[in-house]
């Protein structure tokens, strides 16, 4: 009984103490400024400790788990040996214990990101060679799939003769032929007979060449030169006929310029084809040439005709005629001799704009030979009846137009020659040192004299006039002058 009374009194006292506790500190308020301030300070301290703790933990993880990498580049340098020969030495990294780690993890950490470093920055030459071989193989496969399936041999006929610009013209033609991706035979017909100069020049090409000599010498007039070049081309066709060369015959003059697409286009011809030729009427006097064109435009009140010679087609891509370069505006103003400065005009139909199948020239009769081609046995008789390539066919309308039916110009006709009496070294090869025309302190030939000839020095002195210095002339202008005893000053 006493125990239950004691417990009841204990719980009553405890409940009254809890109820009376707020009244003991009446100044306590949860919304006071001091409590808010301390709450904000507590939050800032928590946030700062969180940031510092994250950063500290990141650094600890970085130092514990990151590997130290040493990047050693092999630096090439030149070292002169005892024999005076430069040798290329390469520095190799030292064999250390960390080499194994370098091979496993070639990574340098900068900030938070890693940079991958190659052991050698330059590509492997063996891999580069394999890549080039793969590209060549791919190009060959593409040509076999999309290009000419069974290409024929290209037979090129070039008439030439020894002159000042022969090396200039033959260099361009030779390098164009060297780039042809098909089998090629180059027939060079030289006027005046075979010379060592021309033979040594065409031998540099490395092509299959047939060097023929022609007895007649090249004349000095353009009209006679066109006729002789026709005979030289027909002489080459006779060789094709006798040797039964199989392929596509094209006529490449030594001064013409050819596009590489031309050699792909002629592979499509079946028997006899024609293409457009750009005519570059050269003239040493540009003002005279422009005046001729203006006069033509003023008379006709139309634009001058395009300087192109080739086939003309209709909307159905069929040959209907020929576009010939109009030479009437240049009447009596064209060059007669080779070394004149007047414009040089082409012949009626240039041979360079035609290609033909070499089987048309064979003596043996072919079953599939077209009937519109003439009997070319006249090649054995003479050259009088043939003036242009169209003389080889009976019906010119059967000629196959090439180059998008003549709309694409794939070669250009140009005639540029030097004076007939101009001097030039044979083959443009200088065997002896040149004469010194301008003295220099250092000359490439120590044995030669560095002084000008006495006659040249006297002529230079006679032509030179004494120069008056600017300061002296200025003083003379500023000095006062006297007129009739009156002294006049230069300044007011």
From Swiss-Prot:
Q: What protein is this chain from?
A: Probable beta-1,4-xylosyltransferase IRX14H
Q: What Pfam families does the record tag this protein with? A: Glyco_transf_43
Designated gene of the protein:
IRX14H
Found, by tissue, as follows:
Expressed in developing interfascicular fibers and xylem cells in stems and developing secondary xylem in roots.
S-S pairs: none
Highest rank taxon of the organism: Eukaryota
Q: What SUPFAM superfamilies does the entry give?
A: Nucleotide-diphospho-sugar transferases
Question: Where is the stretch described as Disordered?
Answer: 457-492
GO CC aspect terms: Golgi apparatus; Golgi membrane
Could you tell me the EC number(s) of this protein? 2.4.2.-
Subcellular location per the Swiss-Prot or TrEMBL entry: Golgi apparatus membrane
> Which enzyme class?
transferase
Q: Does the keyword Cell wall biogenesis/degradation apply?
A: yes
A Gene Ontology annotation in the biological process aspect, one of them, is: cell wall organization
Species name for this entry?
A: Arabidopsis thaliana (Mouse-ear cress)
- Which intervals lie on the Cytoplasmic side per UniProt? 1-33
